[in-house]
């Protein structure tokens, strides 16, 4: 990354000094390529600041799925810096072009060294490498026929227990290393002695952000979306509806399932995930706001952890009093990167000299979790309840990354069960293995779930398999878990709701619906905040698939080169039959467009 920056600066100086009389076209071309390369490098630096790992699955997912509910305050300065840098880049580009005249242009091609440095600056740009690796991973065709999915029935063969999941935002096992972080998490360190602690839990691909970690640990699958086909999933009504998750299994057994989170449920689709998978009550910031003592006591992400854990403990007491099996899942927030936040109740308890903000936050949350667990473990609720303390994912780039990145990093995973003997288990495992392992403690015969395995009785698939290859071998099956709605179940467009209804399913529009050979839904594409117009996606369709496109009339007319009058807010539907080389454009309210109309249109010979 820094090598590329050095080469960019060096190539600018050398190219600037290598000007000679030559082709004005070549001058423009080399100038454009140079400044494009510089622009993409600046974008990479910003993405790296967000993720700590360059352009990865988490960055792509949030660009695709959406960022509503995003705690944006801590990113204002770096984002402003990105904008300023690119304004300067654009200004330099304009000035550079302005000075290129027919009498003073391009570099002397005999001066090989400037060209070499310039090419090296392009080839070393990590933006291209990360993007290529992601696209290659998502589009590669692996000829592996083995099905690693565990799909046998999971049922109770022992007495049912309640279950509590406490996801600790970006708190990983590495923070427990006393040689590196002495006395950083003394409470959780002490609690570990009373738990079944798994010390060797890795993060496979597509699991290292919050909703991905939740899907992996509860469903045993990575959070893949059809990125190669630019499918955002942001407008789909159900989140991995065909995945079999802990919530689905417990819901069938009449468990009362609840999720309490301090942030906006819309962020990354967390609320949709829990509602899809059997949870009766799903609450985030807006649902909890009116129950808070002080509505102004919140971080940029939502409810502070001291307030959240107090709400969770009271909810556990309430659920326990109802004499019905329950599952309660929650996620803390204070340790969110890059610097974390400090709850008022432990604001005076800084770590060491207090100069590292994220470590202060981790130290504070350790205190809050310790207080919660001290109350829970001596209560009657613990008699028939299994509690899980775990990472949602490894820490992203924060004020301690320079220390964390030098270590062998693992996820936190501890199970507290009064009927089980405390011990430490160093078996190789990954986030997929968490779900089936936990379920075995609450009475289920869970040998596996998805790509996960019960680490108490089985070896993780990580032991004998390359996980990237394993995920790719099951990619089609994983993508099918999104289960697009079917036209045969009905088709109705509501302009008022900006939705397309397929029976009891729906998607948002604008949308591009690509059909398969049976003229059923194969893919659905959306326009994420108008960042990539659907017209571009239509143009890039490589096959002769039929499709429906619902969008503003102006965009459809422009694509089809139609000169028609329309109101600025009018929406149209384009039906394009690429096999018969014909199309039809209609205002949404011009005809009764239903599933029969679509079926008849595309069945026309």
Residue locations for each model-derived region?
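Transmembrane and membrane-interface helices of multi-pass
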Residues: 1-134, 601-605
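Membrane-interface soluble catalytic domains
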Residues: 12, 17-20, 265-268, 420-605
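Active-site-proximal alpha/beta segments of enzymes that process anionic O-linked groups
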Residues: 51-61, 85-86, 90, 114, ...
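Substrate-binding rim/cap in mid-to-C-terminal beta-strand-loop elements of soluble/periplasmic
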Residues: 212-223, 403-446
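Acidic helix/loop microenvironments that form the catalytic cleft of cell-wall polysaccharide enzymes
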Residues: 215-218, 275, 331-338, 388-398, ...
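Feature representing long, continuous alpha-helical segments
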Residues: 248, 310, 363, 367-371, ...
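Active-site neighborhood of glycoside hydrolase catalytic domains
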Residues: 341-347, 359-382, 410-413
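Metal-dependent active-site segment of extracytoplasmic phospho-/sulfohydrolases and closely related
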Residues: 364-403, 438-445
